[in-house]
UniProtKB/Swiss-Prot annotation:
Pathway: Pyrimidine metabolism; UMP biosynthesis via de novo pathway; (S)-dihydroorotate from bicarbonate: step 3/3. The keyword Metal-binding applies. Zn(2+) 2 binds at residues 98, 135, 173. It is an enzyme of class 3 (hydrolase). Gene3D superfamilies: Metal-dependent hydrolases. Substrate binds at residues 15-17, 41, 135, 218, 250, 262. GO terms for biological process: 'de novo' pyrimidine nucleobase biosynthetic process; 'de novo' UMP biosynthetic process. It comes from Vibrio parahaemolyticus serotype O3:K6 (strain RIMD 2210633). Its cofactor is Zn(2+). Belongs to the metallo-dependent hydrolases superfamily. DHOase family. Class II DHOase subfamily. This is Dihydroorotase. Disulfide bonds: none annotated. Binds 2 Zn(2+) ions per subunit.
Length: 342
């Protein structure tokens, strides 16, 4: 196969940051996506409706594709109120709220300290039909970083799923076979996003032959058996899994340092990277559902009406890309990607 035409995709989990870098991050995400769900862990975090709408306006000023629509999310804190959830839902532009366990990832210090603290908020979300997005890691110091997702499933997510059976929940950027199994075994109200980099790489890519800081992300890359479980889930055709890049840019110097930031940048070539994975598995026929159908279907939003075409045409990824007044090193820098969006 040399070309593949699919319904225009969406990215259900992306970080655009804010300020001067938006012109670059929005350029990449709006190039062929119909919609993207914008993560709210900016500085300061997007904790209320007014902030979310203002952030949306800043994004729209930089968009490059007329078809592109940013979908917004609120950042949940211990102080979020049910009234804020209702106000956000009423806008029609804020489609979800994000649970970051405090300290779990970049700019998450204002996150939720205990899920029980927001049960009254989850009740309001269940009532109005707002989705809950979850960064699925515990932050207890005694839990090994490679075990944080599994521990979260058992101690935090399972009780939420049980206590709020009508709440739609997306377990974001899953990284383990345990998470894939949890989602498969849960009700149809539980789904998951999977990143391109967790499908393409495992912890050996990050650690063998020297530390590769641009592979460092949270949740951290796991062993190859977990990687294979993610590949099987993503390419299976199951409606429970869909595209969410978790593309998370940091300036080159913030990654290549003694205490580097977590996040991998894939928005420059996300669909192309996923296409490589699906082709290698002999499952290209399932890429459209993963990239273009399952996400909007789960969110209760119409699928995009137009299409994009991928062609089998290798191209060179640049060594770096503009990032405001700095540069970002994209995944597969100085290497080739086999597919290209026409």
């Amino acid at each position: 196969m040399t070309t593949l035409t699919i319904t225009r995709p969406d990215d259900w989990h992306v970080h655009l940051r804010d300020g001067e870098v938006l012109k670059d991050t929005v350029r990449d995400i709006s190039r062929y996506n119909g919609r993207a769900l914008i993560m709210p862990n900016t500085v300061p975090p997007v904790t209320n409706t007014e902030m979310a709408l203002a952030y949306r306006d800043r994004i729209l000023k930089e968009q490059h594709g007329e078809q592109f629509e940013p979908l917004m999310a609120l950042y949940l804190t211990d102080n979020t109120t049910p009234e804020e959830i209702r106000a956000a839902k009423a806008t029609g532009k804020i489609v979800a709220a994000k649970l970051y366990p405090a300290g779990a990832t970049t700019n998450s210090d204002s996150g939720v300290t205990d899920a029980k603290n927001i049960y009254h908020v989850l009740e309001a979300m269940e009532e109005v039909g707002m989705l809950l997005l979850v960064h699925g890691e515990v932050t207890h110091h005694h839990v090994d970083i490679f075990d944080r997702e599994k521990e979260f499933l058992d101690t935090v997510l399972a009780p939420i799923v049980n206590d709020f059976p009508n709440l739609k929940i997306v377990l974001e950027h899953i990284t383990t076979a345990d998470a894939a199994q949890f989602v498969n075994n849960a009700s149809d109200n539980v789904a998951a996003t999977i990143t391109a980099h967790h499908l393409l790489f495992n912890r050996n890519h990050m650690l063998v032959g020297g530390i590769k800081p641009h592979f460092y992300c949270l949740p951290i890359l796991k062993r190859n058996t977990h990687q294979q479980a993610l590949i099987e889930a993503a390419t299976s055709g199951s409606k429970k899994f869909f595209l969410g890049t978790d593309s998370a840019p940091h300036a080159k110097g913030a990654k290549e340092s003694a205490c580097g930031c977590a996040g991998s940048y894939t928005a420059h070539a996300a669909l192309e990277l996923y296409a490589e994975v699906f082709e290698k598995e002999g499952k290209l026929e399932n890429l459209e559902a993963f990239a273009s159908f399952n996400g909007p279907d789960f969110y209760g939003i119409a699928r995009n009406a137009d299409t994009v075409t991928l062609e089998k045409s290798a191209w060179d990824v640049p060594e770096s890309m503009p990032f405001g007044n700095d540069i970002v090193v994209p995944i597969r820098a100085n290497e080739q990607i086999e597919w290209k969006v026409k």
